[in-house]
């Protein structure tokens, strides 16, 4: 009987051991599954964070590019402002300059009038020198080809000695500041 008892005990031990092994395997499978789920969740979180990082980096690069563009635009505006700073003053002085030219076109035999005209001519020349220092130039007209960018045709002429579209007379001087027209020349153009 003791042999039977031993056999039963051994069988019970084996069954118990097998049950324990099955339980251990089940626990390991559950742990592996939980670990796999955790890894999958962690990987998903990592991907999400990487995507957010990429998005933030892209926004940063765009903002940096926008800042550089604003900086360049500001520099260009400042340069243009500096370049054309005297335009408003020149526009205000042009009517006075025209009046000087009309006054200087008069002639007189009186010595006093000649002296006054000489003084006016000196002032006129000083204004032209100041204009030149600022980059303000007279737009060439008589003998030039008509250019609507620089000239305003107010009359037509039929001169056989002049070419087609050639300016035959200047009625009012035009001026430009560097590359910008302040006032176009008013001209008479040959047909």
Swiss-Prot record:
Predominant location category: cytoplasm
One GO biological process term: protein folding
Entries under SUPFAM superfamilies matching the protein: Coiled-coil domain of nucleotide exchange factor GrpE, Head domain of nucleotide exchange factor GrpE
Membrane spanning residue stretches: none
GO cellular component, one term: cytoplasm
Keywords assigned: Chaperone, Cytoplasm, Stress response
UniProt GO molecular function: adenyl-nucleotide exchange factor activity; protein homodimerization activity; protein-folding chaperone binding; unfolded protein binding
PROSITE patterns noted in UniProt: GRPE
Location in or out of the cell: Cytoplasm
Matching Pfam families: GrpE
Function: Participates actively in the response to hyperosmotic and heat shock by preventing the aggregation of stress-denatured proteins, in association with DnaK and GrpE. It is the nucleotide exchange factor for DnaK and may function as a thermosensor. Unfolded proteins bind initially to DnaJ; upon interaction with the DnaJ-bound protein, DnaK hydrolyzes its bound ATP, resulting in the formation of a stable complex. GrpE releases ADP from DnaK; ATP binding to DnaK triggers the release of the substrate protein, thus completing the reaction cycle.
Family: Belongs to the GrpE family.
Assembly notes: Homodimer.
Protein name: Protein GrpE
Organism the protein comes from: Listeria monocytogenes serovar 1/2a (strain ATCC BAA-679 / EGD-e)
Gene: grpE
